[in-house]
Swiss-Prot record:
Swiss-Prot/TrEMBL GO biological process terms: cell differentiation; eosinophil chemotaxis; innate immune response; macrophage chemotaxis; monocyte chemotaxis; mRNA processing; negative regulation of endocytosis; negative regulation of extrinsic apoptotic signaling pathway
Function: Galactose-specific lectin which binds IgE. May mediate with the alpha-3, beta-1 integrin the stimulation by CSPG4 of endothelial cells migration. Together with DMBT1, required for terminal differentiation of columnar epithelial cells during early embryogenesis. In the nucleus: acts as a pre-mRNA splicing factor. Involved in acute inflammatory responses including neutrophil activation and adhesion, chemoattraction of monocytes macrophages, opsonization of apoptotic neutrophils, and activation of mast cells.
Pfam families: Gal-bind_lectin
Phosphoserine, modified sites: S6, S183
Gene Ontology CC terms: cytoplasm; extracellular space; immunological synapse; spliceosomal complex
Positions of the UniProt region annotated as 7 X 9 AA tandem repeats of Y-P-G-X(3)-P-[GS]-A: 35-99
Protein name: Galectin-3
Domain of life: Eukaryota
Binding site for a beta-D-galactoside: W176, G177, R178, E179, E180, R181, Q182
Keywords, sorted A to Z: Acetylation, Cytoplasm, Differentiation, Disulfide bond, IgE-binding protein, Immunity, Innate immunity, Lectin, mRNA processing, mRNA splicing, Nucleus, Phosphoprotein, Repeat, Secreted, Spliceosome
Modification N-acetylalanine occurs at: A2
Length: 245
């Protein structure tokens, strides 16, 4: 791949203990309390001693908290704006960076749901979508939009001629391009799901339920113009948020 990452680096369970800066193996959660890109568990990026903030003497302490390793805020381990949230980013054990600096909506979201991507997408942006597939579902649709064009159409179909298939495509000037079809199908009616879309310089990567699923090469090269994602289909949507890794 153009970015220098091998598929072994990207796949969960590759056996690589430090897959070149990924937050744990691709599609998986980092270790307990790990901040994306940190070299030590609980460490903020760029720290030398384990858990210590630059210039701080006590290891593991963030400026100001009473408990070692606590993030500033009303509750230990809670991200600002999410007081008392159990398992909140970034310091709770096993927490995945789903909310990131953007914050994540809470409660059920209205579908179709449009997620603004201010400034467009860019390499190392990770969008995490969580929800539950409805019983007797027909399809799920994720569209990365550039105005009226669809840069990346991700469309799991539960019953296309009695078969389950995932269709990916691009729509430009009201014309669909060549379909790319994927037979691996990790979704189940009535079951919860987590979709992660990682933007790279020349492609999107998609993981579902912590396992790498597919890669889709960019057909629209100006990523900054892709500034919105639309989520629709037969799902109950609980969260959708971007972060940088």
């Amino acid at each position: 791949m153009a970015d220098g990452f091998s598929l072994n680096d990207a796949l969960a369970g590759s056996g690589n203990p430090n897959p070149q800066g990924w937050p744990g193996a691709w599609g998986n959660q980092p270790g307990a309390g790990g901040y994306p890109g940190a070299s030590y568990p609980g460490a903020y990026p760029g720290q030398a001693p384990p858990g210590a903030y630059p210039g701080q003497a006590p290891p593991g302490a963030y400026p100001g908290p009473t408990a070692p390793g606590a993030y500033p805020g009303p509750a230990p381990g809670a991200y600002p704006g999410q007081p008392g949230a159990s398992g909140a980013y970034p310091s709770a054990p096993g927490a995945y960076p789903a909310a990131g600096p953007y914050g994540a909506p809470t409660g059920a979201l209205t579908v179709p749901y449009k997620l603004p991507l201010a400034g467009g997408v860019m390499p190392r942006m990770l969008i995490t979508i969580m929800g539950t597939v409805k019983p007797n579902a027909n399809r799920i649709i994720l569209n990365f939009l550039r105005g009226n064009d669809i840069a990346f159409h991700f469309n799991p179909r539960f019953n296309e001629n009695n078969r389950r298939v995932i269709v990916c495509n691009t729509k430009q000037d009201n014309n669909w391009g060549r379909e790319e079809r994927q037979s691996a199908f990790p979704f189940e009616s009535g079951r919860p799901f987590k979709i992660q879309v990682l933007v790279e310089a020349d492609h999107f990567k998609v993981a579902v339920n912590d396992a790498h699923l597919l890669q889709y090469n960019h057909r629209m090269k100006n990523l900054r113009e892709i500034n919105q994602m639309e989520i629709s289909g037969d799902i109950t949507l609980t969260s959708a948020a971007p972060t940088m890794i």
